[in-house]
Amino acid sequence: MGAKDVSEKILVAYSDVAADILNVLVCNGQRLFEPEMLQEASVVSQYKMDGKLHQQERDVAKFVIDKATNAIITCCGFENQTKVDNRMPLRVIGYDGASYHNQQNNAELYEVITFVLYFGERHWYAPRNLQGCINRRCDKLPDTVRNDYKINVYEIAYLTQEQIDMFQSDFKYVAEYMVQKRTNKEYQPSSGVIKHVDAVLKLLSAVSGNPNFELIIPDVEEGGLNTMDAMIARFEKRAEARGEARGLNIGENIANTNFATEMIKDGEPVSKIQKYTKLTLDRLEEIAKSLNVKLVM
């Protein structure tokens, strides 16, 4: 498992953060979930293919416990995505299916629901359901016999200010950063004390691609810093010391190039890539050449 993958999981694994995400993103701000209602669930499952046993791992999984009966009523999975995944519905089916498979001998079944937290600056352009992933179909079969499976994708960089203000956990600062990074290219942090300082900085480092967030952790811990504005001041001081540009700006051209690169790898057509990146055909051809692939026209 890569270090970046681990960093993305840490913050959401805290029950106060997971409950807050459910309350804001899923329940529109209603405080229906409490941290005490959530318990750790196994993120690892196994399946057999080609006669061999394989292992798959979710990012985070939480059981929702009924207070009255102490029974599991739901398993909530959380998947953190910094990039668009064209096969995300297939991954989610695999995770959810494994959770249902594990219940085969249970007297009663609980539901399994997965939430995809997408931290990219561009809209999620990939399929959000199984049928959107299918390329080959038998036209002799009616649609009524075809099964589908949708995924729940939440675009963190496109949350409204009203939604951001609803957050009561540290996830507020991550959402705030992603939205401001997309709209302003510069981050002006709000006030407030951060509870999970280490986890917030590691997640910001992972979703922004900027290692300075994680590199200031020793300074933050030594100085007892626990507010975002104080940590950003330390971040900028470190950036200046390394001769980097002040602030949290990312070059628009670099961002567009990186995004186009991922879309070209995914086999997306030129028209779709240009819609999201505004790059010229010549530039896209240069990127494709560097990847040793052909553009899809």
Segments predicted by a language model, with ranges:
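Elongated, amphipathic alpha-helical interaction scaffolds
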Residues: M1-M297
